[in-house]
UniProtKB/Swiss-Prot annotation:
Taxon lineage: Bacteria, Pseudomonadati, Pseudomonadota, Alphaproteobacteria, Hyphomicrobiales
Species of origin: Bartonella quintana (strain Toulouse)
Catalyzed chemical reaction(s): heme b(in) + ATP + H2O = heme b(out) + ADP + phosphate + H(+)
Functional description taken from the UniProt entry: Part of the ABC transporter complex CcmAB involved in the biogenesis of c-type cytochromes; once thought to export heme, this seems not to be the case, but its exact role is uncertain. Responsible for energy coupling to the transport system.
Binding site for ATP: 35-42
The protein, known as: Cytochrome c biogenesis ATP-binding export protein CcmA
GO cellular component, one term: plasma membrane
GO biological process terms on file: cytochrome complex assembly
Length: 208
């Protein structure tokens, strides 16, 4: 399985966010996307997933010469946690488990992996920012998807949670998974590719 992007570009109204961006990702590999706020990291992730259309270029996922939509093989974690605020933590995860349909771990097992078993009966909206993010990450464990595409996954996490997440990422990579993550901070595990998005901003836009 190979996930690649070729000569990608994105525009925001008349502004060119980035252009000429290419990458190629294989199993067991982590690619991080860095850059200041507003430069287009989230836009790039959404283009890769297929939520946005690139202004130029294309993204492809190939396995044994067959091409597949990226969305069919990925978990996407955006800046929002995609949880219903007044449902309990466990009810939220049970909803996602039923939605995915292909079980890898039960909601209780996913929470245990994240060290969050005690939070299961609590309404999602009473959790701290970091706890909410960890519950959202637990969603990735419910059903196996080889590609994880993550937007600032460690935002709001304390050092203990960041270490736990780094171990989780490494386990996914060791199992043949791929991860693409926008981040301001390193995860503490080896990065195979690092895209500094400011390098793909046209020089005129950069000066402005």
């Amino acid at each position: 399985m190979v996930l690649s992007g070729k000569d990608l570009a994105a525009h925001r109204k008349e502004e060119i966010l980035f252009q000429g961006l290419s990458f190629c990702l294989f199993p067991h590999q982590l690619m991080t996307i860095t850059g200041p706020n507003g430069i287009g990291k989230s836009t790039l992730l959404r283009i890769i997933v297929g939520l946005f259309e690139a202004a130029e270029g294309h993204v492809s996922l190939k396995d044994h010469e067959q091409t597949y939509p990226v969305a069919t093989a990925c978990h996407y974690l955006g800046p929002q946690n995609a949880m219903k605020p007044f449902l309990s933590v466990i009810d939220n995860l049970q909803f996602w488990s039923a939605f995915y349909g292909q079980y890898l771990r039960s909601p209780h097992e996913a929470l245990a992996d994240m060290g969050l078993s005690d939070l299961a009966p609590l309404p999602f909206n009473v959790l701290s920012t970091g706890q909410k993010r960890c519950v959202a990450i637990a969603r990735l464990l419910l059903s196996y998807r080889p590609i994880w595409i993550l937007d600032e996954p460690i935002s709001g996490l304390d050092s203990h949670a960041q270490t736990l997440l780094a171990n989780l990422f490494q386990r996914h990579l060791n199992q043949g998974g791929m991860i693409i993550a926008a981040t301001h901070s390193p995860f503490g595990i080896p990065e195979n590719h690092k895209i500094a998005l400011e390098k793909f901003v046209p020089s005129q836009e950069r000066r402005e």
